[in-house]
């Protein structure tokens, strides 16, 4: 996988992500997903108004996972389809979900085998690989752990305009397993990165930017 260096010339960002044609932004994001590079995904300003780093679950490396942990909140979430969650036998984190946006956490997980404390970048990758394996069953992972699965609603961003659904949509559109990893992008002072900071971060690391609105528009056109 390519390194996450400032010098990568594969992406040219405008001052604002919306200034570039939608087809170009989508293509760059899907290329990044396939190549194991993060995508910066912004949700609606009147929703969480946050930026997440998104990686395809099957393309994780110690370097891109370490970047995610270092630059983000540290709460690494694995976005999965309802079928995959059912296959793993994961139950909801709570019976009565009262979160503002209905964020569908399951119980946290750890790989049953191959990890130590579960906290390191390598251990978290091991857990994620165990969970997304095609033949993974209810014995693939244990709870609690240091990876936090999220369940994407069926119908994706056309039903729920969330980072969870957007992440799974990106993986699927890239022709990859419909599973992705996300973590909320943060500023150095511990506050959440909003649109201006997210744009600056993406430009620094030459990362593609998309919004949930972009994905909704694309789905409405292309299905």
From Swiss-Prot:
Pathways involved: Cofactor biosynthesis; riboflavin biosynthesis; 2-hydroxy-3-oxobutyl phosphate from D-ribulose 5-phosphate: step 1/1
The entry's keywords: Lyase, Magnesium, Manganese, Metal-binding, Riboflavin biosynthesis
Gene3D superfamilies for this protein: DHBP synthase
Domain of life according to the entry: Bacteria
Pfam family, one: DHBP_synthase
Catalyzed reaction equations: D-ribulose 5-phosphate = (2S)-2-hydroxy-3-oxobutyl phosphate + formate + H(+)
Annotated EC: 4.1.99.12
Cofactor binding note: Binds 2 divalent metal cations per subunit. Magnesium or manganese.
Positions of Mg(2+) 1 binding: 48
Binding positions for Mg(2+) 2 per the UniProt entry: 48, 163
GO molecular function annotation: 3,4-dihydroxy-2-butanone-4-phosphate synthase activity; magnesium ion binding; manganese ion binding
Transmembrane segment boundaries: none
InterPro entries: DHBP_synth_RibB-like_a/b_dom, DHBP_synthase_RibB
Protein's GO biological process: riboflavin biosynthetic process
Cellular component terms (Gene Ontology): cytosol
Cofactor: Mg(2+); Mn(2+)
Residues the UniProt record annotates as site (Essential for catalytic activity): 146, 184
Sequence positions that bind D-ribulose 5-phosphate: 47-48, 52, 160-164, 184
Assembly behavior: Homodimer.
Entry similarity comment: Belongs to the DHBP synthase family.
Function: Catalyzes the conversion of D-ribulose 5-phosphate to formate and 3,4-dihydroxy-2-butanone 4-phosphate.
Protein name as catalogued: 3,4-dihydroxy-2-butanone 4-phosphate synthase
Provenance organism: Cupriavidus pinatubonensis (strain JMP 134 / LMG 1197)
């Amino acid at each position: 996988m390519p390194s996450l260096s400032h010098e990568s010339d594969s992406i040219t960002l405008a001052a604002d992500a919306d200034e570039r044609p939608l087809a170009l932004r989508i293509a760059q994001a899907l290329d990044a997903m396939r190549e194991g590079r993060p995508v910066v995904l912004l949700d609606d300003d009147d929703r969480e108004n946050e930026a997440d780093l998104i990686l395809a679950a099957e393309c994780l490396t110690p370097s891109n996972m370490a970047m995610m942990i270092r630059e983000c909140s540290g709460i690494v979430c694995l976005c999965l389809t309802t079928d995959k969650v059912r296959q793993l036998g994961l139950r909801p984190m709570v019976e009565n979900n009262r979160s503002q946006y209905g964020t569908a956490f399951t119980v946290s997980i750890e790989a049953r085998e191959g990890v130590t404390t579960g906290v390191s970048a390598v251990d978290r990758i091991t857990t994620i690989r165990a969970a997304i394996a095609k033949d993974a069953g209810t014995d693939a992972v244990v709870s609690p752990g240091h990876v936090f699965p999220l369940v994407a609603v069926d119908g994706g961003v056309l039903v729920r305009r969330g980072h969870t659904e957007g992440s799974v949509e990106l993986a699927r559109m890239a022709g990859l397993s419909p599973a992705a990893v996300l973590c909320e992008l943060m500023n150095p002072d511990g506050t959440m990165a909003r649109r201006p900071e997210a744009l600056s971060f993406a430009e620094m690391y030459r990362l593609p930017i998309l919004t949930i609105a972009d994905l909704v528009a694309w789905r409405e056109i292309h299905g």
